[in-house]
């Protein structure tokens, strides 16, 4: 049985840990509020640019744009959004596991895929296994701005246009609320949804006149749209990260409180046993003197 001193030391150290996790929980809660606001405020922009792309791409003259049309897939690109730090439950592991399993299932060679990582967790995991990481970025702030992701977003589009890969998927955690999120896999390129809408739409867009031409507009608009999708996913993932960390720290704080209660009970029992032992020894000694 542990001594009273050992138990007391464990209670003290657990209480200090509880104070740290409680503070981290409160910090994450504050960050979550702002992250949710950032994600919500960005949605109207993405929605509006999508409407514009839909109108332009639905014309017959622009349906053959290379970013809108599927082509034979020889190589697949994977964008993986994770965090730089842990202490966020399964936030990182769920995304990494999904991508890892997908690659192992679909590809037999590293020449058949390319990984783009955002966050140290994904980079370290895939590089430790000598997997094909072609682009990486770390140090994304808690409340990112587009400049932080612009290079990797524009390079993603450029590599597709250059034929480095023939399709691109993005994997991230979608924020639902403070206690739940869901893993999302979305196709970024090619933008076949607009090509299909162009075939299905009942709206006659031939009366629209474009200046400059539809192709010239799409040359600028489509890369911006894909970049906006990547940034929007990053904002969403950041909200999910803060929520996951807040939940993990709350759970850690609750577990620490339970452990302190158990240790306190154990301490009191050990102390009572020690006192009982001392009384027994005193009584026994007194009886021996009689």
UniProtKB/Swiss-Prot annotation:
One of its GO terms (biological process) is proton motive force-driven ATP synthesis. It is a peripheral membrane protein. Keywords: ATP synthesis, Cell membrane, CF(1), Hydrogen ion transport, Ion transport, Membrane, Transport. Its main location: membrane. GO terms for molecular function: ATP binding; proton-transporting ATP synthase activity, rotational mechanism. It is found in: Cell membrane. NCBIfam families: ATPsyn_F1gamma, PRK05621.2-1. PROSITE patterns: ATPASE_GAMMA. It comes from Listeria monocytogenes serovar 1/2a (strain ATCC BAA-679 / EGD-e). InterPro entries: ATP_synth_F1_ATPase_gsu, ATP_synth_F1_gsu, ATP_synth_F1_gsu_CS. Produces ATP from ADP in the presence of a proton gradient across the membrane. The gamma chain is believed to be important in regulating ATPase activity and the flow of protons through the CF(0) complex. The lineage of its organism: Bacteria, Bacillati, Bacillota, Bacilli, Bacillales. Gene3D superfamilies: 3.40.1380.10, ATP synthase, gamma subunit, helix hairpin domain (1.10.287.80). This is ATP synthase gamma chain. One of its GO terms (cellular component) is proton-transporting ATP synthase complex.
